[in-house]
């Protein structure tokens, strides 16, 4: 049986992945699967820079708004769902296109990740629960920098799980999870968008400013009022930074600057992770030739049977 071709567009936040994916889908008769761990949640629209129906431009999208913020959507769940939708899109005679910045989720689709059979150490986990999230993430960064590059400091639950797995097995969480052999079912082309660091950071700052103009504070306040302050859905950047403001512990400007700072750091970690963990064909973003170069690489890839 021939392998299913899949175009995968990755890169840091605010680099232009969404607009490129729409253009490629139009020209290559594709449908798009979101590879973003946050855009699966309903109601998390502004803070996740979720694509709007207008921006979709009649291109069918999958794995957007599929669960409530109170329900965790794990990498294992993403793996299962994405593989299902790849098959569905392919059977319909369309080209599956995955776009997103959550490297662990995307990689899990194409490599045979093991999500799971390490048991728990409840006593050790209870000890870790007593530590603050910054210290926990620093512990992870020292012991397993690859996992730390992918897991955000705010995601305390996942940081603790990574430390727990290392405690129980003696090997890094990142090594435990992935077998570096591509799954035989798919033939992926990984296209990465890169941008001058200063320009990328300016884009990020501008995006955060726009989020505030579009109502990010109201969106975050709804989560806060629903007591959804510790669920994985709000561990992403853009929500928890506002909670101290709601509690009168920081100013709105301080919250905005913290979101911008955390977003810049996250973009840097994304780039590091993609460069170290996946074989990616990199394209310069933000120039007049970006779309043409991506289309040329995709058409060449698809022409090889």
Curated annotation (Swiss-Prot):
The catalysed reaction is: adenosine(37) in tRNA + dimethylallyl diphosphate = N(6)-dimethylallyladenosine(37) in tRNA + diphosphate
User: Location of site Interaction with substrate tRNA?
Assistant: 102
Known EC number = 2.5.1.75
Please indicate which superkingdom the organism of origin belongs to.
Answer: Bacteria
Q: Output the Gene Ontology terms for molecular function.
A: ATP binding; tRNA dimethylallyltransferase activity
Q: Which residues form a coiled coil?
A: none
Biological process per Gene Ontology, one example term: tRNA modification
InterPro entries (alphabetical) = Dimethylallyltransferase, IPT, P-loop_NTPase
Kindly state which keywords UniProt assigns to this record, in alphabetical order.
ATP-binding, Magnesium, Nucleotide-binding, Transferase, tRNA processing
Ligand binding (substrate): 13-18
Which cofactor does this sequence's record say it needs?
Mg(2+)
Q: What ranges does the record give for the region Interaction with substrate tRNA, renumbered to this chain? A: 36-39
So where does ATP get bound?
Answer: 11-18
Q: Which PANTHER family match?
A: TRNA DIMETHYLALLYLTRANSFERASE
NCBIfam families per record? miaA (TIGR00174)
Q: What is annotated about its quaternary structure and interactions?
A: Monomer.
Task: Provide the family line.
Answer: Belongs to the IPP transferase family.
Q: What does this protein do?
A: Catalyzes the transfer of a dimethylallyl group onto the adenine at position 37 in tRNAs that read codons beginning with uridine, leading to the formation of N6-(dimethylallyl)adenosine (i(6)A).
Q: What is this protein called?
A: tRNA dimethylallyltransferase
Q: Which gene encodes it?
A: miaA
